[in-house]
Amino acid sequence: MNSANWMTGESTLRSSAQETQAARVEPSAADEQGMAAWLPDWMVRRLSRWNLPAPLALAMITLALMGAILSPLFAASGRLGLLIPGAILGVAGVVIVAKWRILGLIALPIASLMVRFAIGTGSQTGINAAVILLCLLLGLWLLDMIARERQIRLLTYRPVVASLVFGVVAIAAFGFGQLPWYATRSAALPAQFGGLLIFLLSAGAFLLIAHQIRDISELKWLVWVFLAVGLVFFTFRLFPPSYRLMTRIFVRQGVLGAAFYIWLVGLALGQALYNRQLARGWRILAGILVLMVFYVNMRGDGRFWISGWLPSLFVVVTICLLGRPDLGVFAIGLGALVLLLNPQVLSGLTSEGDNAYSTVTRLEAWRIIAELVKVNPAFGLGMSNYYWYTPLFPILGYRISFNSHNNYVDIVAQTGLVGLLVFLWFVAELWRLGWHMLSRVPEGFPRAYVIGALGGLVGTVVLAGLGDWVIPFFYNIGLEGFRASMFVFLFLGGLVAIARLYGIDPGRRDEAQPG
């Protein structure tokens, strides 16, 4: 072969090799482009401003670290073999929820009420599926703001501001809880962190829905899924032979939480009475669900458990008064007549069952906790600590640890009078916003939701006085109780979401008209 032919042959070989290499590279590049197209841009884009890797890489690193930290717990419980499949499912869940955020939102009721999975913490409570999913959604929202919007921007609605202040007060109270207020042991640090987590997740659930609902249809999906799960559960409750199957499907700590009932009643009754755009059959079914809740919770000895039905009764009266004042006045008059003719009904609230003993012990517990808090009335004793201080003051002659069974007393004991005032401010601002929205939101689902949420807010205020149902106390209902209490803050966040979607703000004179 002469030099010319040799050079030509070499050129041909090089060209062929380059084409082959290109042919090998092109599919992987196309695959990479397709993967990037399937994922949100902000997940695969490097955070150059902070010199950090892409959020997806950060999420995988975080999962790896969590796996390393939690592996001893899995090994101790004999579940080490679940760690790798769990990590794979976790990464897949992160990707899916990041792409379709609405799937994560509507999965919250299902995870809360039907998914038993929980990560053990070595204490009396574990990190359940509802907490994990909510933390994932909050983390993705935060990463979205950092990576895509390049700033953390929150709504300026007063309830949003109040919820943020409440979180700050809880963190400050946690700091005060590290001080030795009494010459005895305080709560273990994991228990204090658990108590703080409940406070912060409550505010986080509210902020998440307020900001992440992007269209009224997404809120509809969240409500319909919640009501559907509730309907299935109470259908089981109507038929005792099905209880064994029911206990396999539903998580006891979720479906027996009283907050679950008041929001079922509030949202279902609001849609049944005032959403005239909803088909009549669905409205009737929503009304039947309300009747089922009252029937199941008041039959037999259930009437002794007033947390199961009394707050829901306040929800019904409030919804009737807001939407149909004449109907509300009639309901109140009818109820007053029943009480006049049957005064034993009212006295039975505190005397039937174990209510008499419960009333006496609770009043004494509140008196003792008031004495304990005197050392720091402004910010309280910190998260979960008062439970270990109570034996210093005998209750009915016994030196035992106890909790208050009252959210207002709990808030004062853990975050002081400052925490209670901020919580009441949060509630007042929500009522003010909802009242302002009544005449400004469109008919149909939005207005029915606002009325139902205001009814739920009143029921929540009543319920908080009957137990730690709204912000669970770590040593009583605990993180497992957050499965139900989360709904309070999710659906109150929906109230702010509707205000945002329709441009309603009591602080502005020139509001956007509902479209």
State the predicted function of each range.
Residues 2-68, 88-93, 164-175, 199-208, ...:
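Alpha-helical transmembrane segments of multi-pass inner-membrane proteins
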Residues 47-56, 122, 168, 235, ...:
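A membrane-periplasm/extracellular boundary helix in multi-pass inner-membrane enzymes
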Residues 78-83, 125-128, 191-199, 249-264, ...:
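Membrane-interface micro-motifs in multi-pass membrane enzymes
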Residues 95-195, 447, 460-463:
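N-terminal hydrophobic segments of proteins, predominantly signal-anchor/transmembrane helices
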Residues 145-153, 210-222, 275-279, 324-327, ...:
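Membrane-interface junctions at the ends of membrane-embedded or membrane-associated helices
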Residues 266, 314, 456-515:
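Transmembrane alpha-helices of multi-pass inner-membrane enzymes
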Residues 349-367, 379-415, 436-441:
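Long extracytoplasmic/lumenal interhelical loops at the membrane interface
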Residues 417-461:
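Hydrophobic transmembrane alpha-helices and their immediate junctions
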